[in-house]
Swiss-Prot record:
UniProt protein name: Proteasome subunit beta type-6-B like protein
Major subcellular location class: cytoplasm
PANTHER family (alphabetical): ATP-DEPENDENT PROTEASE SUBUNIT HSLV, METALLOPROTEASE TLDD
GO CC entries: cytoplasm; nucleus; proteasome core complex, beta-subunit complex
CDD domains documented for this protein: proteasome_beta_type_6 (cd03762)
EC numbers: 3.4.25.1
Disulfide bonds: none
Localization in the cell: Cytoplasm; Nucleus
Oligomer status and interactors: The 26S proteasome consists of a 20S proteasome core and two 19S regulatory subunits. The 20S proteasome core is composed of 28 subunits that are arranged in four stacked rings, resulting in a barrel-shaped structure. The two end rings are each formed by seven alpha subunits, and the two central rings are each formed by seven beta subunits. The catalytic chamber with the active sites is on the inside of the barrel.
Gene this protein is translated from: psmb6l-b
Entry keyword Hydrolase: yes
Length: 217
C-alpha cells in the first residue's frame, strides 16, 4: 500500500505531529495528537486541535507549518462552502480534497504543510485522501503522516484490516496515536479523534494519561 510521510522538520511554529485517517464499515475516523513545537525542540502548545472541519462531514488534519496550514484550510473552507452553494448539495469528499490539492500545488514554492482529508458523502461513502506537500492527491483506505508516523508504520500495516467495526477502528486509531506519541518527541498532548458517518460527526478526546501504554515512559 502506498503511504505518504509528511516531513514536519521545518522552521517556525510547526505541528511536528502524528496524524491519521482510517476507513471502517460505514464511516471514517480521522485523528491527531495536539502538540505544536518550534524548531522541533521547544513545545509552544500542548493543546492544538489539528482536525479542521471544512464542511459538515468533511475534515482535514495538518502536518507542517501551522501558519501555512491555517491559511490553506481557511481558503479551502471558503471555496468548499461556495461550491456547495453553487451545486445546492453537500460537497463530495474528493471535491474537498481536490480544493486542498489545487491550493497546495499552486503555492508549492511557498507552502510547508501537508494534509489528510477524510469524510463521508452519499456517492462513495467513507473516504480518505492524502494531499502531499507538492499537491499530489492519493486515495487510500487508511493513511498516516507527520513525524510520529515513522514509529507506527509496522503497527499500522500489521493491524489494519478492511471493514473494521467502529469500535475496532477507534481502538486501532487510539493505539496508533499512543504508540507514536510515546516515541516521537514532537508528538504529544491529547489524542483528538473524529468519527464521521452518514448519521453525523462524533468528537472523541483522550487525555494523554488515559492513552494505552505499551512500554515504560
Amino acid at each position: 500500500m502506498e503511504r505518504h510521510f509528511m516531513d514536519s522538520q521545518i522552521k517556525g511554529v510547526s505541528t511536528g505531529t502524528t496524524i491519521l485517517a482510517v476507513t471502517f464499515n460505514g464511516g471514517v475516523i480521522i485523528g491527531s495528537d495536539s502538540r505544536a513545537s518550534i524548531g522541533g525542540s521547544y513545545v509552544s502548545s500542548k493543546t492544538i486541535n489539528k482536525l479542521i472541519q471544512v464542511h459538515d462531514r468533511i475534515f482535514c488534519c495538518i502536518a507542517g507549518s501551522l501558519a501555512d496550514a491555517q491559511a490553506v484550510t481557511k481558503a479551502a473552507k471558503f471555496q468548499i462552502s461556495f461550491h456547495s452553494i453553487q451545486m445546492e448539495s453537500p460537497p463530495l469528499v474528493k471535491a474537498a480534497a481536490s480544493v486542498l490539492k489545487e491550493l497546495c500545488y499552486n503555492n508549492k514554492e511557498e507552502l510547508q504543510a501537508g494534509f489528510i482529508t477524510a469524510g463521508w458523502d452519499r456517492k462513495k461513502g467513507p473516504q480518505v485522501y492524502t494531499v502531499a506537500l507538492g499537491g499530489m492527491l492519493l486515495s487510500q483506505p487508511f493513511t498516516i503522516g507527520g513525524s510520529g508516523s515513522t514509529y507506527i508504520y509496522g503497527y499500522a500495516d500489521a493491524k489494519y484490516k478492511p471493514d473494521m467495526s467502529k469500535e475496532e477502528c477507534l481502538q486501532f486509531a487510539t493505539n496508533a496515536l499512543a504508540l507514536a506519541m510515546g516515541r516521537d518527541n514532537v508528538s504529544g498532548g491529547v489524542a483528538h479523534l473524529v468519527v464521521i458517518t452518514e448519521e453525523g460527526v462524533e468528537h472523541v478526546v483522550i487525555p494523554g494519561d488515559k492513552l494505552p501504554k505499551f512500554h515504560d515512559e
